[in-house]
Design a protein with these regions (language model features):
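Short, small/polar residue-rich loop motifs at catalytic or cofactor-binding pockets
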Residues: 1, 53-59
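Conserved "boundary/linchpin" sites in short secondary-structure elements
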Residues: 1-17, 38-41, 65-77, 86-100, ...
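Soluble non-cytosolic domains of exported or imported proteins
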Residues: 20-31, 79-83
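Amphipathic alpha-helical protein-protein interaction surfaces
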Residues: 29, 42-45, 54, 80, ...
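Stable alpha-helical elements in mature extracytoplasmic
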Residues: 29, 33, 45, 84-88
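Surface-exposed patches in mature extracellular/periplasmic domains of secreted proteins
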Residues: 45-50, 103-104
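Short loop/turn motifs at secondary-structure junctions and domain boundaries
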Residues: 50-55, 108
């Protein structure tokens, strides 16, 4: 009986990645989230990367709680440049909190978004 209760109490986690389409559950949320982090990221592009002309890409897992608060941010694949990895994590924290879950995400406790972040020439950040 305790195992059943523990299973029932575990958080409902939904994962979105680059392969998720606009028809997938939470696709609208992922798109709004992407726009926000790109806007914040371009406003807060890392000075060290700009000065030293460091470019690259990394994969990041961002986990968001139902209320929009940040649960976790984790580098899954490093860019090989600590300044970029740290900047991506900082940008996620600066952009928080995010919108609370509504609509098709209302029954989800935590949303995991996995994206590739690109720090590009022209000091531009994009993610997909």
């Amino acid at each position: 009986a305790q195992e059943v209760q523990a299973y029932a109490k575990r958080p409902k986690i939904h994962r979105l990645n680059a392969a998720s389409t606009m028809r997938d559950k939470g696709a609208w949320y992922k798109d709004e989230w992407r726009k926000k982090v790109e806007r914040i990221g371009n406003l807060n592009y890392p000075d060290d990367a700009r000065r030293q002309r460091i470019y690259g890409s990394l994969r990041l897992l961002v986990s968001i709680n139902r209320d929009g608060s940040l649960y976790e941010v984790q580098v899954l694949e490093s860019s090989g440049q600590a300044v970029l990895d740290q900047a991506a994590q900082r940008i996620v924290r600066l952009a928080a909190p995010y919108a609370p879950f509504t609509g098709d995400l209302a029954d989800i406790d935590r949303l995991e978004i996995i994206r590739t972040w690109r720090f590009e020439r022209g000091d531009r950040l994009s993610s997909n």
